[in-house]
A protein has these predicted regions:
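Detector for C-terminal structural segments
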Residues: 1-46, 61-64, 96-107, 127-253
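Surface-exposed patches in mature extracellular/periplasmic domains of secreted proteins
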Residues: 6-9, 75-81, 117-120, 192, ...
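Short beta-strand->loop
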Residues: 49-53, 90-96
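Residue-level detector of anion-binding/catalytic polar loops
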Residues: 73, 115-117, 136
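Short, well-ordered beta-strand elements
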Residues: 85-94, 116-119
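Short alpha-helix C-terminal cap/hinge motif
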Residues: 105-116
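Short helix-initiation/N-cap motifs at beta->coil->alpha
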Residues: 118-128
Length: 253
């Protein structure tokens, strides 16, 4: 497969949380029990799979049940609240290329009465609306890292949520997130850093403020194997182009 599903902020790194919280993670999470989703103390989230029509129907039934429990019901083919207002979401994008991803999603949502409108706008307007948090759904790329730090206070910190043009476009305000980011930035060793990162990832994932999409787990580089040679192993987190320029060599004729 060309792409892999994203699962959490720190997927494909040592900072990624897996399984249930370790004792070190629980020590950081326990003070926030009752203030974060209870699921945080269980297994890490796994994106739902749709291996065919049958699994898609099962997921749609689960979604419909959750919406019904929240007070939404279908009337005249549309999912409506107690006031009779339909659930309409706008997907903001800076170009029309996202339609290939959004259109199938919109069709599936339509089956449970939800209307998803794809709204491509020019980049200037897109940026302006993003800065003012004037959107329902959009796509953002969070840069992968194995050494996260203070930038996460801008991405998910409570103070940043009230500052226009900040990185906290989700608007999350959580004392637990603030404390875990602080713990992460004050870590003096990997043994202190990793539990803080994994605990933060669990809280963000179980808050369901982000819909994980995908990443490419490989670098695609076309080259002449007769003329160029390369090391057998690529170092972790290396950029493909830079690695090729810095370490490949010419084969002898």
């Amino acid at each position: 497969n060309s792409y892999q599903r994203v699962n959490g902020l720190f997927g494909n790194t040592e900072c990624h949380a897996t399984g249930t919280p370790s004792s070190e993670e629980l020590a950081l999470l326990e003070p926030w029990r009752g203030k974060v989703p209870e699921a945080v103390f269980g297994p890490m989230t796994v994106p739902p799979r749709t291996d065919g029509d049958s699994s898609l129907r099962a997921n749609l039934r689960k979604a419909k049940a959750l919406l019904n429990a929240a007070g939404w019901s279908v009337s005249e083919g549309k999912l409506r609240n107690a006031r009779g207002e339909p659930l309409v979401l706008e997907y903001l994008d800076s170009n029309e290329g996202g339609a290939r991803v959004v259109t199938p999603w919109a069709r599936n949502l339509e089956k449970i009465g939800v209307t998803l409108v794809f709204r491509p706008v020019d980049f200037a307007l897109y940026q302006q609306r993003l800065q003012k948090f004037d959107f329902d759904i959009t796509t953002l790329a969070y840069q992968g890292t194995h050494n996260p730090g203070q930038e996460y206070a801008d991405l998910f910190g409570s103070k940043a949520a009230d500052i226009e043009d900040s990185g906290n476009v989700t608007g999350i305000k959580s004392p637990a997130v603030d404390a875990l980011v602080d713990r992460m930035t004050r870590a003096r060793s990997k043994a202190e850093l990793l539990p803080a990162c994994r605990s933060l990832e669990r809280v963000i994932a179980h808050s369901h403020i982000l819909i994980p999409q995908w990443f490419a787990s490989t670098h695609r580089i076309a080259y002449n194997a007769w003329r160029l040679a390369r090391p057998a192993q690529m170092p972790p987190y290396a950029q493909g182009e830079g690695w090729a320029i810095d370490t490949w060599w010419a084969n002898k004729p």
